[in-house]
Each structure stands twice: as structure tokens, then as C-alpha cells.
Amino acid sequence: MAAKDVKFGNDARVKMLKGVNVLADAVKVTLGPKGRHVILDKSFGAPTITKDGVSVAREIELEDKFENMGAQMVKEVASKANDAAGDGTTTATVLAQAIVNEGLKAVAAGMNPMDLKRGIDKAVSAVVSELKNLSKPCETAKEIEQVGTISANSDSIVGQLISQAMEKVGKEGVITVEDGTGLEDELDVVEGMQFDRGYLSPYFINKPETATVELDNPYLLLVDKKISNIRELLPVLEGVAKAGKPLLIIAEDVEGEALATLVVNTMRGIVKVAAVKAPGFGDRRKAMLQDIAILTAGTVISEEIGMELEKATLEDLGQAKRVVINKDNTTIIDGIGDEAQIKGRVAQIRQQIEESTSDYDKEKLQERVAKLAGGVAVIKVGAATEVEMKEKKDRVDDALHATRAAVEEGIVAGGGVALVRAAAKVAASLKGDNEEQNVGIKLALRAMEAPLRQIVTNAGEEASVVASAVKNGEGNFGYNAGTEQYGDMIEMGILDPTKVTRSALQFAASVAGLMITTECMVTDLPKDDKADLGAAGMGGMGGMGGMM
């Protein structure tokens, strides 16, 4: 086992604080409408330019192991805030730095760290309750646009696109962010249910100019197995041919003789058919086939429930107004499914989302809800260079998460004002059990001014003057660093999602409390490489002597 280096008390805390400040100072320059960029070197390719706090935090690793421990703990704050609300990482880092700096000064002055922590926890709990009182619902398209704009570093086009996307696919809908091909940002909305499986044979294409298969008012045959024998399909094909409608087959796979016969029939114009693989794998595939069945009022032909493909009739087939298939995707538009059954299925999947512990599973279930509930929106980010594209994509992702958080828990005045107002409201009545807890409460409430001060500093103004003016104001009165004007923050469209502000404060206080109560730090001693090399060299010399 490697030897350890151990530091106690003030020695440990000084080192840890240095690491906290290095990381926080690098992250906090990105805060606010006039926040600066940080350039991150990459081991290969062009450097990355970003204004995303968590991206900066993730890159920082310090040489001194004690300092690095401090930095890593603040990095945890940024990551946790990012996971919880998708934004607010820089605010969380600034708050953590402020609480740790104030707290460690009090510890150095001889106060009890545990009582300080209890005081901080009381202050945070009271401020979180007050934030909920200050919060107002985020419902209108204008408010959604404003939240998106602020979170994308005052990029109004991004705010508009997110607002339009939510209008088109609903607040629960899936909105994804992809690389665009031009210089402009675009919004692409896919209505209906789309899944990532294309046609099994290019011979099914009936629109050569777009290389797609388009079927109007088709029947849909849903099968939970591979189809290789055409005999199994004959009864269904005959029924569909008599009805004079096209057919889409969605199965685990269609291969061999069955696929060849379908292609020949399509090319001869006997019956208009297309086949695609079912989306997903394993249990997820079965669930998605069932989703399609409910959407199109069909039945999944599954041997598990004793159904046979040869005995399938037209009553077992689903129907839709239109189906469009390209080489990568299949889109089912306007299935004829019963609205009540679709809503029941959506409610069932939402229940699974609530119970799921895996982020990946939640994301996949959320996608299924969106596909059943009405569509998917894709924001295509345009930029002149790849470096700009990465930076912009990060901002759009942040804005999207912030907007979802705003819809979920409402909005408060932005620009650091909500924390200042909430802190002022609880300061008068909140008392600790002893004097040291009161100091903890005061230092936590004082630290809550830090985001406002940092936004002002990044805008090149004097933080103390602005903070004093804001504290003397009331309600939503604050300072708009973008236009350098005072006024009502909500009227000016400077909004923060309540969830983002709340999460940032809670995670910052949690980690800062642990750091203030740290008394000992243990790390591995660095290995002495020179000594190792020297020993190896001596061994070689001995060998030489033996040969002589």
C-alpha cells in the first residue's frame, strides 16, 4: 500500500480553499449576459471555446493533490446542479465559493464548524421556502422564450426556437438538439410517431425524387417475430389487395423468400407494400410495438399470447392517415387509435418514468410519451466553424434544460435578484440555537449576494454600488447587466427558473458545509521516479560486472 500524506486543521483547509478558488475563479468569469469565454485545450483537434460553467469545471485538474481535492468537491457542485436542472452550474459554483470562503474565515476565528454548518443549513432551508413563495408559473410562450434567451447567454433566436418547439410538440414533447448544415439555426418538427428504422429494401421506394416510401391510408401489420416464410403472410396480403389499400409491415425482421416476394409484388403493382424492422430491442421493442398498436388501433401479432400470423385478419391491422419511410426513419402520421386509450397508455408510461431510477430509461420512456402525445422537435444549430458549433450547442442544451425547469417549477426574477430578496426576507426572523449558528446564518445569507455581484463584475461595473442599490429596492427591482439599466427584472424579461436557482443553492450549501467541517485530508504521497530509475540503473551495472 502506498504511503500517505496527511494534513490537519488549518493547513488542510488553506490548501483545500486554494483549490476551490482556482476552479471557481475559472468558472465564474462565464456568468451573466456579459460573461467571458474560457478556452479549453484538447489533446487533439482545435481547442474548445465555451461559456458553459460545467464544461470548464470538468476540465480542471490541479497538480497539488490537496488543492485538487478542494477543486473536485466544487466540481461536484457544478455536476450535481447540471444533473438536477441542466443549468445553474456557474451560479452553484459561485455560491459554493462564497459560502466556503466566509465559513473558513469563521472557523479560523475559532468558531465551531458544526454549529456554523447547522446555521448555514437553516438559512438555506428558509431561503428555499421563500423562493417557492416568490415563484410564479411559466406558462406563456413569451415567458418560455425569455427563459430560453437568458439561459442561452442572451441569444434571442435560441429562445424563440425553444418557445416555438414547445408550442408545436407540447411541454412534455421531445426536443432534441443536432448539428445544422447552414449558418442559421433551424427548427424541424416531426409530427406523428417517428422511429429510427428505415425500409428493408430500396425497391419499396415509390418517390424516387426524395428516395422515400409514401403510403396513404395504409394498413399496418405489427408482428413480434421474424418473417421468412411468405405463406404466413398470404391471408393478410390477399385481404389488403381486395381492400385496395397499401400495407406497412413492422416486424422483428423480414428476410429471405418473404422479402423477395414482397418486393416482386410491389414492383409489379399487385399490392403496395413496405416493410421495416420494429424499433428498439428486447422488452423495449415489445413495448414500442404495443405503443404503435394503440396509436393505430391495431393488434400486435405475438406467439406469446397464442396468436398466429396465418390467422391474422384485417381487423387485427392498424390504420393511419399516412406513413413516410426513408432509409433511416419511419414516420406514422395520424393513427386512428382511440384517444382515451392513447391517454391511458401515456399515463401508464409516465408512471414508469416516476418509478424508474435510471436516467437512460427515463429518457427512453420520455421519448415514448412524446411520440404517442404528438411529435418530436429538432433544433438544428447553425455555425460557421466546428468550434463555434460546439459552443453554441452547449448553450442551446442549457437553454432547453432551463426552459423545462421553468415550466416544471415556475420562474423568479433573474440576475441574482431572487436570492437577494429571499435572503433579506428571512434575515429578520431567522435565529439559530446559539451565537455560532447565527454567524452561520448570516454568512450564508451574505454569500447569496455573490451571483449578483459576479454578474455585475463580469459586466465591468462596480459590484458594491449595484448590490447596494438592488438591496435598497423592492420586489423584482434589479440590475440588467445586458443593458446596464435598473428596473423590474420580470418586465425586462430577465427570468431564472426557480428549480435552477433552488438546486444551485442547495447543492452549493451541501458541499460547502462538508468542506467547512473538514479537519483532516489524506492523499497518496507522490512516487519518487528518480529513485526508481536509479535502482534500475544500478541493477544493470551489476549485470555488466558479472559479464566481465
From Swiss-Prot:
Biological process (GO), any one: chaperone cofactor-dependent protein refolding
GO molecular function, a single term: unfolded protein binding
Tree of life domain: Bacteria
Chief location: cytoplasm
Enzyme class: isomerase
PROSITE patterns, alphabetized: CHAPERONINS_CPN60 (PS00296)
EC number in record: 5.6.1.7
Classification via Gene3D superfamilies: GroEL, GroEL-like equatorial domain, TCP-1-like chaperonin intermediate domain
GO cellular component: GroEL-GroES complex
UniProt record similarity statement: Belongs to the chaperonin (HSP60) family.
Self-association and partners: Forms a cylinder of 14 subunits composed of two heptameric rings stacked back-to-back. Interacts with the co-chaperonin GroES.
Official protein name in the record: Chaperonin GroEL
Annotated source species: Haemophilus influenzae (strain ATCC 51907 / DSM 11121 / KW20 / Rd)
Upper taxonomic lineage: Bacteria, Pseudomonadati, Pseudomonadota, Gammaproteobacteria, Pasteurellales
Gene name in the database record: groEL
